[in-house]
């Protein structure tokens, strides 16, 4: 059962829309895809990232946990006075979707080193499942540093970063943004997959024009 983890250089960089694009792309290649949100914070019942992904792709997903306050998951649990997420619980839950022909696309919470529980991060979960990563980055001033730091943190932990994807680019990008698009691949050392247009509301028409060769490494499902 292959996993693909999607992490960001921070919060609000376009990670959910990027996850939706990757989910739809894999589904269009004939894969059985299950989108998963590990932890949602700060959203009302029936709202949040996993519902956005379903709305954009038409593919329903699963969510492990949610907390009321828009905080890092361990802090949100602490504030609510409930037991924090346990590492073994989340690994067991993910492995419960066991199906050799399914790809589980896992959206993290914030960045790679955000604490999901008191003593573990998204990087630890990805490592335990031997899962590759896609890093979603902002594209404006300061983004090169954030992207390089995220890729370096992943590499130090023995994780494979398949690519860096810009979560949002304005219709009229400024000079810093335009130059950053040319530099991401050089400074991170991994392929840069381009950037999603700001205000993207549908993924189907957009995905049809995209190519993510690194995702072709996932075994194609048998013809039926």
Curated annotation (Swiss-Prot):
CDD domains, alphabetized: DTBS
Keyword Glycoprotein among record annotations: no
Keyword terms: ATP-binding, Biotin biosynthesis, Cytoplasm, Ligase, Magnesium, Metal-binding, Nucleotide-binding
EC number: 6.3.3.3
Pathway: Cofactor biosynthesis; biotin biosynthesis; biotin from 7,8-diaminononanoate: step 1/2
Pfam family membership, one: AAA_26
A GO cellular-component term linked to this record: cytosol
MF terms in GO: ATP binding; dethiobiotin synthase activity; magnesium ion binding
Cofactor: Mg(2+)
InterPro entries recorded: DTB_synth_BioD, P-loop_NTPase
Subunit structure, as described in the record: Homodimer.
Family: Belongs to the dethiobiotin synthetase family.
Name of the protein in its database record: ATP-dependent dethiobiotin synthetase BioD
Lineage: Bacteria, Bacillati, Actinomycetota, Actinomycetes, Mycobacteriales
Gene behind this protein: bioD
């Amino acid at each position: 059962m292959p996993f693909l983890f999607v992490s960001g250089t921070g919060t609000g960089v376009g990670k959910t829309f990027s996850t939706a694009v990757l989910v739809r792309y894999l589904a269009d290649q004939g894969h059985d895809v299950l989108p998963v949100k590990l932890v949602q914070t700060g959203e009302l019942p029936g709202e949040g990232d996993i519902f956005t992904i379903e709305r954009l792709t038409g593919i329903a997903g699963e969510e492990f946990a949610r907390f009321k306050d828009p905080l890092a998951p361990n802090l949100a649990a602490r504030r609510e006075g409930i037991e924090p997420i346990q590492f073994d619980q989340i690994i067991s839950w993910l492995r419960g979707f066991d199906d050799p022909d399914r790809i589980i696309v896992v959206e993290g919470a914030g960045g790679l080193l955000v604490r999901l529980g008191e003593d573990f991060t998204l990087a630890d979960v990805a490592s335990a499942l031997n899962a590759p990563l896609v890093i979603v980055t902002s594209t404006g001033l300061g983004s090169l540093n954030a992207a390089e730091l995220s890729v370096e943190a992943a590499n130090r932990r023995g994780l494979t970063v398949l690519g860096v994807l810009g979560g949002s680019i304005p219709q009229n990008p400024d000079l810093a943004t335009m130059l950053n698009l040319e530099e991401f691949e050089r400074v991170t050392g991994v392929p840069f997959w381009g950037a999603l247009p700001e205000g993207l509301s549908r993924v189907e028409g957009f995905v049809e024009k995209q190519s993510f060769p690194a995702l072709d490494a996932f075994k194609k499902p048998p013809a039926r």
